[in-house]
Amino acid sequence: MARTLLILCTLMAWAWTGEAVMFKLTPNTQKCLKEDIQANQLVIGEYEVSDVPGQVIDYIARDTKGHILSQQEHITKGKFSFMSEVYDAYEICFISKVPPHQRGIPQEVSLSTKKGVETKSYEGIGEASKLKPLEVDLKRLEDLSDSIVRDFVLMRKREEEMRDTNEKTNSRVLFFSIFSMCCLLGLATWQVLYLRRYFKAKKLIE
């Protein structure tokens, strides 16, 4: 029973590891895939592009500040990797280039990525440490659980930061509203007094 449960959990873990996408890239356009990645995580990717004579595709991986982490021109099939230095939204862009005189056709692009615990080779770890297959699976699940816990901690931290920002914004809006009302009341009072003096000067009122 325990082994069956472990195998089921392992299969669920494998289902969550590795992300693969496939799309068609229109000539002379670019498509970017973006994802939030924690700090100090290894990202490994593998890509393949359908071959069309006279057309080329470049790829570039960068962060929100525009720092280039990986780049390759005229790609067909290959791999890339980079390390995330800080928590940020990282993007991988594929750029199609077709000569002006050529009528381009869409190219098919496939991309498979892994990050963090997904990049570990547990088979190699098992062989080096002389672990049994069941122990390797347990090690995989342990690392995956730690990764999920870190993700939840980070999400909770970001939630608290957003809540604090929201509360500060609400306080500023309330202060600005009160200040605006005080200004309007002061202006209205000044107008009433001014008109009262004006009408008295014109002897329209006593």
Swiss-Prot record:
One GO cellular component term noted in the UniProt record for this chain: membrane
Regions crossing the membrane: 173-193
Lumenal side of membrane: 21-172
An MF annotation (GO) of this entry: cargo receptor activity
Stretches in topological domain Cytoplasmic: 194-206
Coiled-coil parts of chain: none
GO BP, sorted A to Z: dorsal/ventral pattern formation; endoplasmic reticulum to Golgi vesicle-mediated transport
UniProt KW tRNA-binding keyword: no
Membrane topology per record: Single-pass type I membrane protein
This protein's UniProt keywords: Developmental protein, Membrane, Signal, Transmembrane, Transmembrane helix
Signal peptide per UniProt: 1-20
Lineage: superkingdom: Eukaryota
Subcellular location: Membrane
Family: Belongs to the EMP24/GP25L family.
Reported function: Eca and bai are essential, though not redundant, for dorsoventral patterning of the embryo. Specifically required during early embryogenesis for the activity of maternal tkv, while the zygotic tkv is not affected.
Name of the protein in its database record: Transmembrane emp24 domain-containing protein bai
Name of the gene encoding the protein in the UniProt record: bai
